[in-house]
Amino acid sequence: MQKIPLIVIAGLTATGKTDVAIELAQLIDGEIVSADSMCVYKYMDIGTAKPTKEQRQIVKHYVIDVVFPNEDYNVALFQKDATKAIDEIYQKGKIPLLVGGTGFYIKSIVDDIEFPEMGDSKQVRQNLYKELEEKGNMYLYEMLKNVDSKAAQSVHPNNVKRVIRYLEIYFLTGKKPTDFLEKVRKKGSKKYNILPLCFVMERSLLKERIDARVEKMFKIGLVDEVKMLLEMGYSKDLKSMQGLGYKQVIPYIEGNITLEEAKEELKLRTKQFAKRQSIWFKYQGDFIYLDVGNLEFKEVVKKCFELCKSVV
């Protein structure tokens, strides 16, 4: 069976993946599958740095706006949606590009990961967020320590989303999260001929990029977007509303912090997120790492285009 060519553009937030991918897709007659765990949510555009409608008119994108903010979405669902999209793109005679910064989403395709079955997590998650609101994050963290000390050691108590995710696994499967995740099988993709690119950047330059991106988000209407979501009835406790760009703005809307404090908090959290991404991607040895920090946009596109010739 002939393998499907697949161009992967992964990497750190604010390194220009989207713009390069759109330009590259036009050069190789491709379409883009988004690999971003926040871009799946409808109505959440600015805080997720989602490709604009204009960009999506230039090059078709998949796995964007697939669920409402109060609906569940996870890596297993992404794998199913992305695989379908890649097949559809290839059947049209075009080249699929998998683009984003959510590492586990990308690895689910690149490694063809096989996920054990889990039940519906919505009610469990709601109960855990209620516990969080009433008793605080340390209560949940201590709960995780009692359930699985190894999992607790791997996560900071303030990383509430990850703590809750681990507890979900326990309550849905009855197994320790670490035991459950060890059963996730990496088969290695036999279906795709993959060019795995990963954009990286020197830390000080990346921090400047992040600061500029956050300022732009506020300038083009991030606060109004978060207000709109709250007015639509989407709770601040939802998984989607706990994401970067939303969680940091809500205290400002509630009158608890100033606008400048909200900006600084988002900048800080985004930099921390980028650091976690950097560590994660650093240990994924199957990527070709491109330092895009000191390259002109056209140079990055050209370099990617030349590398594409090995699989296209």
Curated annotation (Swiss-Prot):
<keyword id="KW-0547">Nucleotide-binding</keyword>
<feature type="binding site">
    <location>
        <begin position="13"/>
        <end position="18"/>
    </location>
    <ligand>
        <name>substrate</name>
    </ligand>
</feature>
<dbReference type="GO" id="GO:0052381">
    <property type="term" value="F:tRNA dimethylallyltransferase activity"/>
</dbReference>
<protein>
    <recommendedName>
        <fullName>tRNA dimethylallyltransferase</fullName>
        <ecNumber>2.5.1.75</ecNumber>
    </recommendedName>
</protein>
<comment type="subunit">
    <text>Monomer.</text>
</comment>
<comment type="similarity">
    <text>Belongs to the IPP transferase family.</text>
</comment>
<keyword id="KW-0819">tRNA processing</keyword>
<feature type="site" description="Interaction with substrate tRNA">
    <location>
        <position position="125"/>
    </location>
</feature>
<keyword id="KW-0067">ATP-binding</keyword>
<dbReference type="InterPro" id="IPR027417">
    <property type="entry name" value="P-loop_NTPase"/>
</dbReference>
<feature type="site" description="Interaction with substrate tRNA">
    <location>
        <position position="102"/>
    </location>
</feature>
<dbReference type="InterPro" id="IPR018022">
    <property type="entry name" value="IPT"/>
</dbReference>
<dbReference type="Pfam" id="PF01715">
    <property type="entry name" value="IPPT"/>
</dbReference>
<keyword id="KW-0808">Transferase</keyword>
<dbReference type="GO" id="GO:0005524">
    <property type="term" value="F:ATP binding"/>
</dbReference>
<keyword id="KW-0460">Magnesium</keyword>
<feature type="region of interest" description="Interaction with substrate tRNA">
    <location>
        <begin position="36"/>
        <end position="39"/>
    </location>
</feature>
<dbReference type="GO" id="GO:0006400">
    <property type="term" value="P:tRNA modification"/>
</dbReference>
<feature type="binding site">
    <location>
        <begin position="11"/>
        <end position="18"/>
    </location>
    <ligand>
        <name>ATP</name>
    </ligand>
</feature>
<comment type="function">
    <text>Catalyzes the transfer of a dimethylallyl group onto the adenine at position 37 in tRNAs that read codons beginning with uridine, leading to the formation of N6-(dimethylallyl)adenosine (i(6)A).</text>
</comment>
<dbReference type="InterPro" id="IPR039657">
    <property type="entry name" value="Dimethylallyltransferase"/>
</dbReference>
